[in-house]
């Protein structure tokens, strides 16, 4: 493995780990950064699956206590049964739309301009949602109803547009639907588990011929890096939301999106092949 390839894997692992669970769009950042450092082609498709799995495993590890409790109580406890049902209900809309439109979305929307516009629009919506007066109905994830879960699941479908952010769509959706900031964030993390695992399994099957033994060192670098930085990002976000709003992420989205649009408009960067991964 050449040093430059290892460096590319490290950078993209960092990007995936830091952005997957922050409301700033990991897919959008991956498209932009991968193009800037020249990481593309068939290997990139398999690599992205690996680093996404690493990120979700980091969340599983962070919430292992809650997961164990739910699994233990599922046969007999109503609360655990309702929580599991809510996750499945929220997961369902993304499954349906993903199966029907994933290839079409990847073909038509995976480009820097879509990413930039989605970043800006999402940032504006995030600012509006934060400044809007909220009536909190569900302080904790266990207080959610199936209707809350379904609405958040529908909001998650917006994240199929690159640049929108899965966590951003579900967290802001949760806030608008009456969840506390803590409940919306935690449910977003839990919903990421079946959603991302399902997407990774589906993509892994579709691109199964792209996994080659000679790429294992590259995958290992990306996997470890993504896992470590995702764990750090999750811990930092959970601590951050205790005393802060999501406004800082909103302004970052807007600034980053406008920067991408400016580089495209004034031909400062050639984005012609971005997204071809």
UniProtKB/Swiss-Prot annotation:
Main location: membrane
EC class: hydrolase
InterPro entries: UppP
Any Pfam family: BacA
GO BP terms: cell wall organization; peptidoglycan biosynthetic process; peptidoglycan metabolic process; regulation of cell shape; response to antibiotic
UniProt entry tagged with the keyword Membrane: yes
TM region(s), chain numbering: 47-67, 85-105, 108-128, 187-207, 218-238, 249-269
EC number: 3.6.1.27
Keyword Lipid biosynthesis: no
GO molecular function: undecaprenyl-diphosphatase activity
UniProt keyword annotations, A-Z: Antibiotic resistance, Cell inner membrane, Cell membrane, Cell shape, Cell wall biogenesis/degradation, Hydrolase, Membrane, Peptidoglycan synthesis, Transmembrane, Transmembrane helix
Topology in the lipid bilayer: Multi-pass membrane protein
Subcellular location field: Cell inner membrane
Annotated catalysed reactions: di-trans,octa-cis-undecaprenyl diphosphate + H2O = di-trans,octa-cis-undecaprenyl phosphate + phosphate + H(+)
An example Gene Ontology CC term for this record: plasma membrane
Annotated function: Catalyzes the dephosphorylation of undecaprenyl diphosphate (UPP). Confers resistance to bacitracin.
Misc remark: Bacitracin is thought to be involved in the inhibition of peptidoglycan synthesis by sequestering undecaprenyl diphosphate, thereby reducing the pool of lipid carrier available.
Family, similarity comment: Belongs to the UppP family.
Protein name, per record: Undecaprenyl-diphosphatase
Gene source species: Pseudomonas aeruginosa (strain ATCC 15692 / DSM 22644 / CIP 104116 / JCM 14847 / LMG 12228 / 1C / PRS 101 / PAO1)
Lineage: Bacteria, Pseudomonadati, Pseudomonadota, Gammaproteobacteria, Pseudomonadales
